[in-house]
Amino acid sequence: MIDYTQYPDARGHFGIHGGRFVSETLMAALEDLENLYNRMKNDEQFLAEFDRDLAYYVGRPSPLYYAERWSKKLGGAQIYLKREDLNHTGSHKVNNTIGQALLAKLSGKKRIIAETGAGQHGVATATIAARLGLECVVFMGAEDVKRQAMNVYRMRLLGATVIPVQSGSKTLKDAMNEAMRDWVTNVDSTYYVIGTVAGPHPYPQLVRDFQSIIGREARRQIQEQAGRLPDALVACVGGGSNAIGLFYPFLNDQDVKMYGVEAAGHGIETGKHSAPLNAGHVGVLHGNRTYLMSDPQGQIIETHSISAGLDYPGVGPEHSFLKDMHRVEYVPIDDNEALQGFRDLTRIEGIIPAIESAHAMAYVTKLAPTMDKDQIIIANVSGRGDKDLMTVARIDGIEMVEM
């Protein structure tokens, strides 16, 4: 049996995926980061500071909530929700930014940069930068700046410089391109806080490790509440950090099924989606080999999702590996299904999820009725939906005005 905790290998590979495909300029910085992380990941003082920040600044552990009404309505499995939406800054993203900010501080760099799609990673990075007194620059696609005006204002309030990226599709991919360019130019003074389990090694590993607090807590909580492990885990996948954070501590438990939910946009058959694990090809993007949305010549094609946070043409290399190994099943949910998931959770449980998380909720409505009533699903509510109210209101034909 495969021991999934042994990945990545020493060169950052998950099977054929991962690795470090970057310019020579960045090699030394990545090797320094890898060496620093390898020293710190078992350092008692570093881990104690990380745990202290998660407890007293973020508010962890996040609750594991039994969604009783929703479970009864769907008539199948019992549904538990991991409430990452209740973290400080409103999503799972802060788990990673706290860890990386501590690494940045140890590396002596005073300037941090980040890319962001929905704005949640940008907000989390700007928040930690404010707390540590670091200069912060956030790159965000111009299209996403329009979609997520509230988060842009939050970042600026926190003291960050937000740079709208006008190139390409003006979304997350382009923001990451610009962040990488900035890093190449300013590598000696700047630490790049990558927001997901993508990018060159060691980022997929260290982001996973920081986010795995989600699954470690959920594992303990479900055993306390139900006396056993769950039968299924469900989480949305863009780059895939919230999903790998939930999945990783369960990967060696063969009886626990796992479902990663990709953004099918207007539908897989239309080509207007963000589902590389369902309809992509292996290629190299942002420093790692993984499944990508690309044409037959290997060129990246434009993606679409109602969700800015899932609107990305790649995916973390560990997810690509888990697909190849048939350990995780990756399923598509389109924009309309995600909107219904958003409405269902809001109306039935009084929890307004992020549109990203709503993709996972939509899949729960399909999965739960196919399971027995004594079975258990844990679904990750990766973020809260305040940032998406304008988007949903527009779809509903409601004009939001200032009071």
From Swiss-Prot:
PROSITE patterns: TRP_SYNTHASE_BETA. One of its GO terms (molecular function) is tryptophan synthase activity. Its cofactor is pyridoxal 5'-phosphate. Its EC number is 4.2.1.20. Pathway: Amino-acid biosynthesis; L-tryptophan biosynthesis; L-tryptophan from chorismate: step 5/5. Tetramer of two alpha and two beta chains. Belongs to the TrpB family. This is Tryptophan synthase beta chain.
